Amino acid sequence: MSKIPAVLQRVAKFPVIGSPLFIISNPKLVIAQCTNGVIGSMPALNARPASQLDEWLHEITEALAAHDRANPGNPSAPFAINQIVHKSNDRLDHDMQLCAKYKVPVIITSLGAREDVNQAVHAWGGVSVREIRSVPWGGVVMHDVINNVFAHKAIDKGADGLIPVAAGAGGHASAKSPFAMIQEIRQWFDGPVALSGAIASGGAILAAQAMGADFAYIGSAFIATHEARAVDAYKQMICDSNSDDIVYSNFYTGVLGNYLKGSIRNAGMDPD
């Protein structure tokens, strides 16, 4: 059985983390996810200018606190902020200070494993949740990885949990089978794991759990919601598309990822 930090056990209804969607995720979506039993998340960099992140974190924490007061028997799930920890992110220090101010329960790190970032998040609860997992409200770090090598590096640097980004995940993703990734990771890691990759139904969530994941990491399905910051035409495209409409390529950004053919055409390019 996985060792799950107490903060992640606050999920009210579903073993689901709503993945942070570039541009699209916003406070309204995060609040809706959390108040309906899903760990909601958004990228810190979606707040533009940087000062807007303070306003957004205030909005989220106040809304969730109000919900919990009004619904003591149905508390909100925790929320998460995604931080790009690569050295190219010149906002990281500023954004991390704001996350510390609001004691963001979960930090999702991407593009590099940073021991200093992990230690800072753990300090919000006053103790490392890796050592004492019963801490009621300590910061937890989940790190997204595309293979077992990076998974080891993330845990060695102090991350608490892993997000294997398997084949089929929206945006930048691995081509590895989720069966292989989960099996390799579970051979040595018993902490929280959230599986990403083509999960958009209750059956897929159950399958992820059967493989050994604690949570399903779902992004694309939340694009087609009222709260998502996307145009209606794109939301409809999400609903109308199927697996044959997905292109896996490194042509557009230099990094392999999954893209919708319709989006590629709308950008004036030929997906074929």
Set out the residue ranges of the language-model regions.
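Active-site entrance/lid segments in N-terminal catalytic domains of soluble metabolic enzymes
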Residues: 2-192
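Acidic, glycine-rich active-site loops and adjacent beta-strand->loop/helix elements
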Residues: 87, 168, 198-199, 221
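Conserved active-site-proximal phosphate/metal-binding subdomains
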Residues: 178-194, 200-272
